Amino acid sequence: GSAGLGALVLFAAYANDLSYFAANGDTYPYFKDIGEISFSLANPYVVAGLLFGGLIPYLFGGIAMTAVGKAASAIVEEVRRQFREKPGIMAGTEKPDYGRAVDLLTKAAIREMVIPSLLPVLAPLVVYFGVLLISGSKAFAFAALGAYLLAVIMNRVLVAICMTLVGSS
């Protein structure tokens, strides 16, 4: 709840900063002659940004849950291996190799979380530069990026609430 409201404040700051930079194009050359940035739904790039932004929280959640499953499978295989190779574990005469299991789990978790970690960093860049290349307009690119951010904010709140209620978070 409060994180979602905080994110909405950040979106308002994004829109406010865009207006400021566009109005002061002489001071900020990248924004010179950018024109007005509109988040109107009549702009197809805004709609595309909303659709792409709505997808990202679900994609992130799906990839992250798959990563957890793969890491869990790796640890199950390690435990089975230790039971096979050290039959005294069940009898209490041998100790399991906890260090190897923890090391294996840590490596698997780090390896599996690379793509979900890159997704929030690379997706906004793809939106901005993709729209910029297609439309040739910085104003459309910034509008699509703003719509993307707004959709991510709204959908991530819903995904977080849903995952909390079903025990996935």
Curated annotation (Swiss-Prot):
The chain crosses the membrane at residues 45-65, 114-134, 141-161. It is an enzyme of class 7 (translocase). The keyword Transport applies. GO terms for molecular function: diphosphate hydrolysis-driven proton transmembrane transporter activity; inorganic diphosphate phosphatase activity. Keywords: Cell inner membrane, Cell membrane, Hydrogen ion transport, Ion transport, Magnesium, Membrane, Translocase, Transmembrane, Transmembrane helix, Transport. It is a multi-pass membrane protein. Pfam families: H_PPase (PF03030). Its EC number is 7.1.3.1. It catalyses: diphosphate + H2O + H(+)(in) = 2 phosphate + 2 H(+)(out). It is found in: Cell inner membrane. One of its GO terms (cellular component) is plasma membrane. Its cofactor is Mg(2+). Belongs to the H(+)-translocating pyrophosphatase (TC 3.A.10) family. Homodimer. Proton pump that utilizes the energy of pyrophosphate hydrolysis as the driving force for proton movement across the membrane. Generates a proton motive force. PANTHER family: K(+)-INSENSITIVE PYROPHOSPHATE-ENERGIZED PROTON PUMP. This is Pyrophosphate-energized proton pump 1. It comes from Rhizobium leguminosarum bv. trifolii. The lineage of its organism: Bacteria, Pseudomonadati, Pseudomonadota, Alphaproteobacteria, Hyphomicrobiales.
